[in-house]
C-alpha cells in the first residue's frame, strides 16, 4: 500500500496519487510504502528513480540500523517496535532524495500510523513547513515515543508480576517473564543501534538538516540513552525475577521430596516388621499369642509416633 502526502508551493497539504506526482510542483513529498507488491515496488522505483534492489533493503526486517549515502539519495535504516503476539522490533527504511522522503516497511508500524493521523487531524503544516529534516525528526520521534510507551507500561506489568510471584509460583507467571525478557532483549539491541544512527544525524552528517534539526536529533539521542538504561534495568529485574521463580520452584520440589522421604522413613520399620511376620519361619515371637496381632500393631504405632516426634523436634513438619 502506497500513501502520498505533500505540501504544495502555495502551502496547501494534498494527498495526490503516485502517478500524479510531479516533484517540481511540491515543496515536500512524503511517500509511505507498506508491504508493497512487486508491481507497486516497480512502479515506485520507476517514479522516484531508486532501484528496486535498493528499495528492497528497506523491506528487509533483519537490516541493521545505519545511515548510507548513495549518489543521489540517503538511506536510513531504523528499528521500530512491532506489535504481534510478542512485542519485538522491525526495520524501517527511510530514503531521502531532493524534496522527497520515502518510508518503506514490510510490517505495520504504529508510529507511522500515528503520524498520518496527526497530519490528517491536526495542523499538518507543523510537520511539513519546516523542511524535510523536521519531517524526518517527527518520524524518528514517534518511533522513540512508541518505545517509551511500551517501557512505561512494562513498569506496571513488572509490579503486577512481583505481586503474583510473592503469592506463589505459577507457570503462567514464568511464561510472562520469559516473554517480557525476550521483548527487552530485542529493544535493547535495537535502541543501541538507533542510538548510533542518531549520533550521525546530530553531527551534520546529512546536509539537508538544519541546525534546529540537529538539535532535535540530539534531544532524541538523549531520550534514546534513557530508554537504553530503562531496558537494561528492566531486563535485570526480570532476570532476578526468573532466579526467584526458579528458586521457589526448587523449594517447592524440595518440600515435596522431604514429605515423601518422611513418609517413606515413617513406614519403613512397620513394613519391615510386617515383612518378617510374613515369612514362613517355624517360630515367631507372639505368633501364637491371642493378643499378638494387637501387640505388634501397637509396636508399629509407637515407632511411627517416635519418628513423628523426631521430625517435629527437627522442624521438618
Swiss-Prot record:
Record site feature (Threonine that confers selectivity for Co(2+) transport), residues: 261
Annotated localization: Cell membrane
Topology, Extracellular side: 280-290
Sites annotated Essential for ion permeation: 254
Gene3D superfamilies: CorA soluble domain-like, Magnesium transport protein CorA, transmembrane region
Name of a matching Pfam family: CorA
Reactions performed catalytically: Mg(2+)(in) = Mg(2+)(out)
Membrane topology (UniProt): Multi-pass membrane protein
Gene Ontology MF term list: cobalt ion binding; cobalt ion transmembrane transporter activity; identical protein binding; magnesium ion binding; magnesium ion transmembrane transporter activity
Main location: membrane
Keyword set includes Disulfide bond: no
Domain comment as written in the entry: The central ion permeation pathway is formed by the first transmembrane domain from each of the five subunits. Mg(2+) binding strengthens interactions between subunits and leads to the formation of a symmetrical homopentamer surrounding a closed ion permeation pathway. Low cytoplasmic Mg(2+) concentrations trigger both a conformation change within each subunit and a loosening of the interactions between subunits. This results in an open ion conduction pathway. In addition, this results in a less symmetrical shape of the whole complex.
Protein role: Mediates influx of magnesium ions. Alternates between open and closed states. Activated by low cytoplasmic Mg(2+) levels. Inactive when cytoplasmic Mg(2+) levels are high.
Self-association and partners: Homopentamer. In the absence of Mg(2+), interactions between subunits are weakened, and dimers, trimers and tetramers can be observed in vitro. Was initially proposed to be a homotetramer, based on the cross-linking studies. This is in contradiction with current 3D-structures that clearly show it is a homopentamer.
NCBIfam families found in the cross-reference section: corA
Name of the protein this chain belongs to: Cobalt/magnesium transport protein CorA
Organism this protein belongs to: Methanocaldococcus jannaschii (strain ATCC 43067 / DSM 2661 / JAL-1 / JCM 10045 / NBRC 100440) (Methanococcus jannaschii)
Lineage: Archaea, Methanobacteriati, Methanobacteriota, Methanomada group, Methanococci
Amino acid at each position: 500500500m502506497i500513501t502520498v502526502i505533500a505540501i504544495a508551493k502555495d502551502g496547501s497539504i494534498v494527498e495526490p496519487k503516485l502517478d500524479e506526482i510531479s516533484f517540481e510542483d511540491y515543496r515536500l513529498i512524503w511517500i509511505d510504502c507498506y508491504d508493497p507488491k512487486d508491481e507497486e515496488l516497480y512502479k515506485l522505483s520507476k517514479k522516484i528513480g531508486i532501484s528496486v534492489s535498493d528499495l528492497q533493503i528497506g523491506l528487509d526486517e533483519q537490516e541493521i540500523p545505519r545511515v548510507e549515502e548513495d549518489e543521489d539519495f540517503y538511506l536510513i535504516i531504523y528499528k521500530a517496535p512491532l506489535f504481534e503476539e510478542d512485542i519485538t522490533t522491525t526495520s524501517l527504511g527511510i530514503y531521502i532524495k531532493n524534496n522527497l522522503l520515502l518510508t518503506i516497511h514490510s510490517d505495520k508500524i504504529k508510529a507511522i500510523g500515528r503520524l498520518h493521523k496527526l497530519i490528517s487531524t491536526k495542523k499538518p503544516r507543523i510537520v511539513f513547513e519546516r523542511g524535510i529534516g523536521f519531517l524526518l525528526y517527527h518520524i524518528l520521534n514517534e518511533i522513540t515515543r512508541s518505545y517509551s510507551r511500551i517501557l512505561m507500561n512494562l513498569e506496571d506489568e513488572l509490579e503486577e508480576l512481583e505481586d503474583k510471584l510473592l503469592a506463589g509460583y505459577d507457570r503462567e507467571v514464568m511464561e510472562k517473564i520469559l516473554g517480557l525478557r525476550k521483548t527487552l532483549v530485542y529493544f535493547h539491541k535495537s535502541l543501541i543501534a538507533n542510538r548510533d544512527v542518531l549520533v550521525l544525524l546530530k553531527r551534520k552528517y546529512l546536509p539537508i538538516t538544519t541546525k534546529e534539526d540537529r538539535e532535535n536529533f540530539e534531544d532524541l539521542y538523549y531520550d534514546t540513552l534513557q530508554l537504553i538504561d530503562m531496558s537494561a534495568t528492566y531486563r535485570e529485574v526480570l532476570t532476578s525475577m526468573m532466579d526467584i521463580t526458579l528458586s521457589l520452584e526448587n523449594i517447592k520440589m524440595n518440600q515435596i521430596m522431604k514429605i515423601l522421604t518422611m513418609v517413606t522413613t515413617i513406614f519403613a520399620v512397620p513394613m519391615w516388621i510386617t515383612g518378617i511376620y510374613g515369612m514362613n519361619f517355624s517360630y515367631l515371637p507372639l505368633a501364637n499369642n491371642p493378643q499378638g496381632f494387637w501387640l505388634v500393631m501397637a509396636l508399629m504405632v509407637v515407632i511411627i509416633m517416635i519418628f513423628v516426634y523426631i521430625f517435629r523436634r527437627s522442624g521438618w513438619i
